């Protein structure tokens, strides 16, 4: 976005990231990034951020995303992920912001290949259900408000880092995705990588995944 000439405002509570990543983005692009340390569920904080900046469009990435943790702590996931969306859409309405892009992933265990028109399918974990519910909230809001434009992006597994090597996926604690886990094993931070599952319909019985590089 910065390289395309857009001004960027970042809101992050740094629960699974660090401010250093923003500094490195500024180094790579040579441009200043406006950033706030805040919880998107905090409506007062979000109202202040919208008031202090001219926002044309919101890209909504805020949310917890660990599938395994969501099965152990479902209420935490429903509270966090849905509340962030409700707070965000309310603050957008108050500020007159009419465009939002939402990061989603809700196809469940449907048979591939996937396409944009297929039924979302039943989700297999609380994390997936929160994404499905957030999609429905945004869809209903768009239907109720003809001025609101909502784009739902259903990603498969994003992976990789910037070609400079200065920014990439470096989560706090135990990684939930494959590449940072592999990287930590290679760096000696963790002893081994365990591959789960041995009865998938593949030549060796292990699971297959498709990935998209973050720069692409």
What role is predicted for each listed range?
Residues 1-161:
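N-terminal Rossmann-like NAD(P)+-binding domain of SDR-like oxidoreductases, especially those catalyzing
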Residues 139-216:
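NAD(P)-dependent short-chain dehydrogenase/reductase
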